[in-house]
Amino acid sequence: MTERRDNVSHAPDAIEGPNDGAHAEETSPGFFSFENLGVAQVQVVGGTLNGYVIGYVAVYLLLYLTATECKFTTEGACGGRKIYGCKWSGTTCKFENPKCSEGSDPSDSCKNEVAYTSVYSGIFACAMIVGSMVGSIIAGKCITTFGLKKSFIIVSITCTIACVVVQVAIEYNNYYALCTGRVLIGLGVGILCSVFPMYVNENAHPKLCKMDGVLFQVFTTLGIMLAAMLGLILDKTGASKEEANMAGRLHVFSAVPLGLSVAMFLVGMFLRESTATFAQDDDGKADGGMDPNEYGWGQMLWPLFMGAVTAGTLQLTGINAVMNYAPKITENLGMDPSLGNFLVMAWNFVTSLVAIPLASRFTMRQMFITCSFVASCMCLFLCGIPVFPGVAEEKVKNGVATTGIALFIAAFEFGVGSCFFVLAQDLFPPSFRPKGSSFVVMMQFIFNILINLLYPITTEAISGGATGDQDKGQAVVFILFGLIGLICFVLQFFYLYPYDANQDHENDHGTEPVERILSPVDVPTPRN
C-alpha cells in the first residue's frame, strides 16, 4: 500500500474520538477570529466573483435590450452609439436599417436588431459555463501540479484577462469577442470552484470547516445580488434610458468582475500555503505529501456517480434558469423586469445566510437531501402545474408562482447550493479530491450548459413561438425540473454518504476503498 500522510486522520471529515471533540471545542478559534478569517477570505473573494459572473447574464441582456431599441431622445445618446445600429435623423433616433425605421416591416431581419434572439441569448448565457466546464476538467491537474496557492493566482490572472476582453467587446459591440471573454472568465471560475472549497476544507479548523465551507455559496449569492442591484441602479437612476449612454453603463457594469479579479490576485499573493500538498516524481509516485494516484477511477465509480447525481440536483432543478432569466420570468408574472430581478437575487442572498447556523447543527447530507426534496416539490406543485394555462386564474397563478419561486430559492439555498461544494469534497478520500471534486464540478457545469442553452429555446418552442403564451412553456419546463429533482432525491436518500476517513485502516487488511464507502457514516458537526 502507498504510504499516506500522517495527518490524513485529522482531515475535516474525519470522525473524532470520544475526547477529541471536547479538546477541539476548547482550542478551536472563533468563527470571526483572524485565524479563521485568514482561511475563509478565499470564499469571500472567490464566491463573490463566481456569483457576479453568474448574475451578469440577466442584467447584461436587459441593458443591451435598452441600448439596441433606438428610442434615445438626444443626439448624443443616439448618434454616439452607431455600433448598436442607431442613427440620429433630424429630431428622432432611428434604426440604420430603413425597413426598421419605417416601423412597417415585421420581418425577423428587423426584429433581430433589437437585443439578441433566443438562440444568441442562450449561447451568450452558456458561454461562461462552457469555459467553466473546461476549467473544472483541468482543475485537478492544476492543483496537483501547482498546488492550491499558485492555482489561486492562476485563476486571478485568467479572470483579469477575460474581463479586459469583455470591455473591448462592449466598446465595439462585438458579440463573438463578448462570448470569448465569457468563455475565458468561465475557465477561471471552473478552476476556482474546485480550488477554493478545497483550500478551506484542508486548512480550516475541523470545528469550523463546514461553516466555512458553506460560505462559498453565501458569497456566491452575494455576488449575484450585487449584479442585480447594480443593474437596477443603472437601469432606473440618473439620466433616463432615452438620454443615457447605455454603452457606458455596460462598461461600468462589466468593471466589477475586473476589480474582483485584481483583488483576488492580491489576496493570493499573501495567502498562506495550504497544509495539503500533492507531489509526484517522474514515475507518477508520490515524492512528498499525498499521492494523487493512490486511488484509481475504477475504485471511485460509486462516489463519482453519486457526485453526478448531486450535480443534477444542483442544476437540473432549474436554479440557473431562475437566475439567468429572472427578469423575463418576473415580467411574465406581471413585475418590472429589473426590479423583479433584484428582488429575486436579494431573496436568494438572504436565504443563503441561514445555511451558516444550519451547518453547525446538521450534517451536510441531512441539509442537502431535505432541501432538495422541498425544492423539487416547489418546482412541481407551485411553479409548474398552477402556471399552466387554464389551471388557475391569472391573479391566483401569479401569486402561487411567485410564492413557489420564493420557496424554491429558499430551499435551494438552505441546503442544496450551500452544501454542494462541501459534499464535492466529502464524497472522496483526501488524496482523490483533486480528481473527484473536479469531476463533480464538471458535471454540474455540463448540466448548467444544458439548462442555459435549452431553457429559453424549449420554453419558446413549447409556447408556440415568441408570440405564444409563454406561461405554457414555463410551466412544462418547471414540471420537468420537479420530476428530475424527485428522482435525484430518491437516489440520494438511499445512497448519498460522505467518505468515511475513519476506516482507512481496513485497506491495510485487504479491503478495497470502494467497499469502505458502501456503508459509511455521516460527517459530524460541532453540535451534531
Swiss-Prot record:
Residues 1-22, 507-528 are annotated as: Disordered. SUPFAM superfamilies: MFS general substrate transporter. It comes from the Eukaryota. GO terms for cellular component: cell tip; plasma membrane. Keywords: Membrane, Sugar transport, Transmembrane, Transmembrane helix, Transport. Residues 1-43, 140-151, 197-213, 272-301, 360-367, 425-438, 497-528 are cytoplasmic. Its main location: membrane. One of its GO terms (molecular function) is hexose transmembrane transporter activity. It is found in: Membrane. InterPro entries: GLUT, MFS_dom, MFS_sugar_transport-like, MFS_trans_sf, Sugar/inositol_transpt. Residues 65-118, 173-175, 235-250, 323-338, 389-403, 460-475 are extracellular. The chain crosses the membrane at residues 44-64, 119-139, 152-172, 176-196, 214-234, 251-271, 302-322, 339-359, 368-388, 404-424, 439-459, 476-496. It holds the Pfam family Sugar_tr. It is a multi-pass membrane protein. PROSITE patterns: MFS. Belongs to the major facilitator superfamily. Sugar transporter (TC 2.A.1.1) family. NCBIfam families: SP (TIGR00879). Facilitative glucose transporter. This is Glucose transporter 1E. It comes from Trypanosoma brucei brucei. The gene is THT1E.
